[in-house]
């Protein structure tokens, strides 16, 4: 099955239940990370933490709570969606495919719709498909505004109105490229939908770049870099296709849980030394302690 965070949550002990033995995997929604930080000293086993289902930028959206969690010797490793600073103890977890919004169909049924759409279009237009413009009032709206204004109009076809998901998947699958600016967080379901459909998502460079290593994701420094020459020269290559599937990520989490990884406090301090903020020029730029505190309140 393609990566989706609901399947990851299913393998976890779920907060407020606490891990009971070494190597347990604990899921905590980011809204409850403060409660976990306050209770961390009461947990006496070593566990792996998983957080997702939220657009909180980790660790800087909840900086003090995140530091306390990362400093705990009982936290083996933390896998997080929208992780803006990664190292051995804090690792990316993809947002993946949205199988949780539609409650009337199972994950398997929704995945089959995706697979059928992929198989319905084996010849793809050498153009970009865009449907991100229907939702602009979001945290990273500047990235979508820049994509709208800077991608040459002759290279992209925008959907005129919202269409059902299955129809949307078929439309996406008929294009070689999918424009995927940031969502309300720095990740977007659209990126992973595009990959599952055999398309090439185009994203702007960010703290998420390492998450896409070995996947056919076209990363640009600026949306103004998108050109016909760039599209023509990009070669589809997917040596890390296994990273598209939830089984890979579950295995990675279990592997780390069994490893008993130990990370020194000074290594954590070093990893957190550079902070990130969001601005129109560089989504991963340094910022002051005052700005860290401001971001932590958003």
Report each predicted region and the residues it spans.
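Nucleotide-sugar donor-binding catalytic core of glycosyltransferases
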Residues: 1-192, 196, 200-219, 225-295
């Amino acid at each position: 099955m393609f990566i989706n965070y609901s399947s990851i949550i299913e393998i976890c002990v779920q907060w407020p239940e606490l891990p009971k033995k070494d190597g347990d995997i604990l899921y905590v929604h980011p809204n409850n990370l403060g409660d976990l930080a306050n209770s961390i000293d009461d947990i006496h086993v070593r566990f792996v933490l998983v957080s997702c289902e939220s657009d909180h930028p980790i660790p800087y959206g909840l900086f003090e709570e995140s530091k306390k969690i990362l400093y705990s010797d009982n936290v083996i490793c933390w896998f997080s969606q929208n992780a803006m600073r990664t190292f051995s103890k804090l690792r990316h977890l993809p947002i993946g495919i949205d199988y949780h919004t539609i409650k009337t169909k199972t994950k398997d049924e929704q995945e089959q719709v995706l697979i059928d759409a992929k198989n319905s279009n084996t010849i793809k237009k050498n153009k970009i498909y865009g449907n991100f413009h229907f939702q602009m009032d979001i945290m990273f709206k500047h990235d979508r505004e820049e994509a709208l204004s800077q991608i040459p109009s002759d290279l992209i076809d925008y959907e005129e109105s919202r269409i059902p998901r299955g129809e949307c998947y078929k439309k996406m699958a008929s294009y070689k490229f999918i424009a995927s600016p940031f969502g309300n967080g720095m990740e977007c379901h659209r990126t992973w939908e595009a990959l599952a459909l055999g398309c090439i998502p185009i994203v702007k460079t960010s703290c998420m770049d390492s998450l896409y290593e070995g996947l056919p994701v076209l990363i640009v420094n600026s949306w103004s870099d998108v050109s016909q020459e760039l599209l023509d020269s990009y070669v589809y290559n997917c040596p890390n296709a296994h990273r598209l599937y939830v089984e890979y990520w579950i295995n990675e989490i279990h592997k780390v849980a069994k490893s008993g990884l130990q990370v020194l406090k000074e290594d954590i301090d070093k990893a957190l030394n550079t902070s990130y903020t969001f601005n129109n020029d560089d989504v991963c730029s340094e910022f002051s302690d005052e700005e860290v505190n401001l971001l932590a309140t958003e």
